[in-house]
Amino acid sequence: MNILADALLPGLDSAFPPPFTVTLYHKADEIPELLHYKDVLLCRSTLKINGDLLKNHQIKFVATATSGTDHIDFPFLESQNISIIDAKGCNAISVADYVVACLAYLDKQQLIQGKTAGIIGLGQVGTKVYERLNAAEFQLCLYDPPKATRDTSFQSCSLEDLFECDLLCVHAELHSDAPYPSLNLINRDFLKELKPGCIIINASRGGIVNEEALLHLGSAILYCTDVYNNEPHIDSRIVSKATLCTPHIAGHSLEAKFAAVAIVSRKLHQMLGLPYPQFATPEKPYRLNENSDWRELALSIYNPIHETLELKHAGNLSSAFLTLRKNHHHRHDFTTYFDSDSIKKYPLLG
């Protein structure tokens, strides 16, 4: 079975041994020619999967090595009987680490006003963030009405409950499905109800926060974001306004990248009735000196202010966004820097 895969994905050789044959693409414009006689297209969320890309090709599977699937035209793929494989949950730990790194920076700058936090979206990522904040004794409001309709053991808070929060963490999937669409959920009416000094950390999708409404908001809201409308052609005004702004890398730890490939591989092997291969894993990092507080430890692993300043000072914002995102490949999950006993001392770190 022939696979065309994004060259930036790690561990492909071990994840797809014979009977698979893997061909790599480095740029999207290489795909139309390379896709001939391929059975599987294995991509990242940066690639738009639609009829324009796949016309005149006979692939059987589209596999995305990411949790999000809003870059995929599901109706088109279904009309062509193309199966879709995703890697949901692969980066949940990595995104939770990112949120903690943002909190570490904000806390050092004395910008966190209180410990009442709202989490919007309680999927695998939001649940990991909940576990961290709950262990650190935040008072939590959990907002996910669709989950409440599916899971009777879960009770969602109301939108009005979120207005009393000092911190909002956005982890919902982007969708427009009634009665609870996430598209433009955080709009003008929502924003004007927030407490002055409220912090929004958006590590989900740009379309959930209405950027125009945010830009025209009169009150002092601190916006920290990893995601934007129209990536990579992001709005320079949002970059200027944001307290922290990073190039869509919250889920990009080394462990998350390897996990994404492994999840896709397992699903494909299972669908084809093949035994699982042995998967590659990243090398473990050095151990950290634990004679520091949680903020220093988190920021020694990843400090979001560095990429923030790179974006804020960029001449060509789109180019800087893509370059920074591509070069973000040295961060490990926080827990890999500690042994299991040590991590218990730092509940926010894992």
From Swiss-Prot:
Q: Which GO terms describe its cellular component?
A: cytosol
Q: Which reaction does it catalyse?
A: 4-phospho-D-erythronate + NAD(+) = (R)-3-hydroxy-2-oxo-4-phosphooxybutanoate + NADH + H(+)
Q: Name one GO molecular function term.
A: 4-phosphoerythronate dehydrogenase activity
An example GO biological process term is: pyridoxine biosynthetic process
Binding of substrate, residues: S45, T66
Q: What is its EC number?
A: 1.1.1.290
Cross-referenced InterPro entries: D-isomer_2-hydroxyacid_DH, D-isomer_2_OHA_DH_cat_dom, D-isomer_DH_CS, D-isomer_DH_CS1, D-isomer_DH_NAD-bd, Erythronate-4-P_DHase, NAD(P)-bd_dom_sf
Broad enzyme group: oxidoreductase
PROSITE patterns, sorted: D_2_HYDROXYACID_DH_1, D_2_HYDROXYACID_DH_3
Signal sequence segment: none
Q: Which residues form the active site?
A: R205, E231, H248
Pathway entry: Cofactor biosynthesis; pyridoxine 5'-phosphate biosynthesis; pyridoxine 5'-phosphate from D-erythrose 4-phosphate: step 2/5
UniProt subcellular location: Cytoplasm
The record's keywords, sorted A to Z, are: Cytoplasm, NAD, Oxidoreductase, Pyridoxine biosynthesis
Q: Does the keyword Hydrolase apply?
A: no
Question: What's the chief localization of this chain?
Answer: cytoplasm
Give the residues the record marks as binding NAD(+): Q124, V125, D144, A203, S204, R205, D226, G251
The UniProt function text for this chain reads:
Catalyzes the oxidation of erythronate-4-phosphate to 3-hydroxy-2-oxo-4-phosphonooxybutanoate.
Task: Identify its protein family.
Answer: Belongs to the D-isomer specific 2-hydroxyacid dehydrogenase family. PdxB subfamily.
Subunit structure, briefly?
Homodimer.
State what protein this is by name: Erythronate-4-phosphate dehydrogenase
